[in-house]
Amino acid sequence: LARVRGDSLVYDPMCGSGTIVIEAALKALNIAPGIRRRFAAQSWKCFQNGVFDEVRREASAQVRRDAVFEAFASDIDPEAVRLTRENAAKAGVAGRIHVRQADIKDFAPEIPEGRKGILITNPPYGERLLAASEAEEICRTMGQVFPQRDDLGYYIISPHDDFEGVFGREAVRRRKLYNGMIKCQVYMYFNSRRGEKA
């Protein structure tokens, strides 16, 4: 839903295992899904020798090596930071993702003049890792520390119907989706004056 491009700056201040920033990097760099994986079908006799290698070469030729994409991932949990680094390395995008341990309260993006940032995050829901009251407090904190800027759009995934009230701002747009079996919404905040998406 967020328009991630080769020149995007993507932020996830609650990165967990790094899924969002890694997927954003793969999209921005036009890296084909599974390009680094080995598939069981590669050993099937019905495929000609070299077919998988040929497809990989074709996909590799499509990678955007000229892209200036960068992602900035952080999490308060040191294990999440470790996992994000490890997963980014496995995906081949570690050089494009800056990872650090940080509290959401300290979120302060530095966006160079003329560029636009996109914050995409999936904060805790208060179902598995935290109590509902702790998850609500995180949403309230996000509303306080996420600046309203023309050069930064927000895409926040939440299952809570009252998210906008807790966050303190009404979304410009909302989109229903399922995160596994959990019914959620993506709350989108961007410069509504010009109708632009970051």
Give the location of each predicted region.
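Conserved S-adenosyl-L-methionine
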Residues: 1-108, 127-128, 134
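C-terminal catalytic and target-recognition region of SAM-dependent MTase-like enzymes
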Residues: 103-198
